[in-house]
């Protein structure tokens, strides 16, 4: 399945002969098609949608998951990015946290139960 970015705020694909469009008011950070699951992963701008800015959609355009951010003892503003590798059920994501400008929190995100785990700091290069 092919996903097309219309612009910074809109993506589309074809499902059963019909076009599916997803639009946001602000920039979409990242889009991934998860071939094995036949689902789309979209990271939207947290300033538009809040901390729950990670969305998983099925190919018909229905939301499969929109997980709450984990409680890690500090504010989590949302997901910054995913280091997506096709076929892996546990993916590495980088969380947006305001407390430290030199390091960010990375963790594992399960594509099975949509939970976050295995938190650690990673160097952030500005």
Each predicted region: which residue ranges?
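Extended aliphatic helical segments
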Residues: 11-14, 20, 31, 49, ...
């Amino acid at each position: 399945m092919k996903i097309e970015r219309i612009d910074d705020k809109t993506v589309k694909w074809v499902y059963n002969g019909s076009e599916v469009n997803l639009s946001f008011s602000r920039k979409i950070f990242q889009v991934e098609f998860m071939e094995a699951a036949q689902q789309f992963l979209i990271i939207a701008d947290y300033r538009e949608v809040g901390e729950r800015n990670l969305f998983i959609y099925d190919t018909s355009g229905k939301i499969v998951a929109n997980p709450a951010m984990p409680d890690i003892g500090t504010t989590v503003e949302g997901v910054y990015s995913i280091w997506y590798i096709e076929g892996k059920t546990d993916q590495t994501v980088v969380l947006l946290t305001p407390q430290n400008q030199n390091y960010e929190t990375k963790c594992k995100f399960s594509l099975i139960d949509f939970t976050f785990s295995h938190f650690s700091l990673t160097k952030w290069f500005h």
